[in-house]
Amino acid sequence: VFNVSFAASGYIPALLILAAFIPFVWGLGSIASAGVLTFRRGSGAIGFLAFALTFTSGAYFPLALFPSWVAPLASINPIGIAITGMRAQLIGGAGWHDALVTIAKLVPLSGITLLLGLYAFRLAMRRERRLGTLGLY
């Protein structure tokens, strides 16, 4: 399809990049859960954040089309980092060095997001228990 060939040597590095990215998603989910617990709403804010991250990831069109002030923000977007790294492995035939550079960028971002998410969820649960409103769900 579309005259694209996948590099078999990129499967394992792409899976490792995906594994480094997954904790970021868990962290976002925990932050979203904490927001819903605390405010009884949050789908609008969560949807906007997901839209902003996805829109600036380069998944739908090249980042070069963005204004110059968006480029620095897009360069630290974990979704964009993961997509670019996996594309390079599967389609571009990039090597292990490129995969390790991508993983080195993703691990701190994923770790920080996961820790923030767990902390936010813990605070939200503590608040709901203290107020006695956990049973409202």
Could you say what each language-model-derived stretch is?
Residues 33, 37-80, 84, 88-89:
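Transmembrane helix segments
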Residues 1-46, 97, 101-118:
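Alpha-helical transmembrane segments and their short interhelical loops
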Residues 71, 93, 113:
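Generic anion/oxyanion-binding catalytic loop in active/binding sites
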Residues 63-64, 84, 101, 110-115, ...:
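Short alpha-helix boundary/capping motifs
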Residues 4, 59, 64, 132-135:
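Flexible, active-site-adjacent loop/turn segments at secondary-structure boundaries
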Residues 2-3, 32-36, 87, 91, ...:
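Membrane-water interface at transmembrane helix exits
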Residues 108-137:
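Junction motif at the cytosolic side of a transmembrane helix
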Residues 26-30, 61, 65, 81, ...:
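Transmembrane alpha-helix boundary/anchor motif
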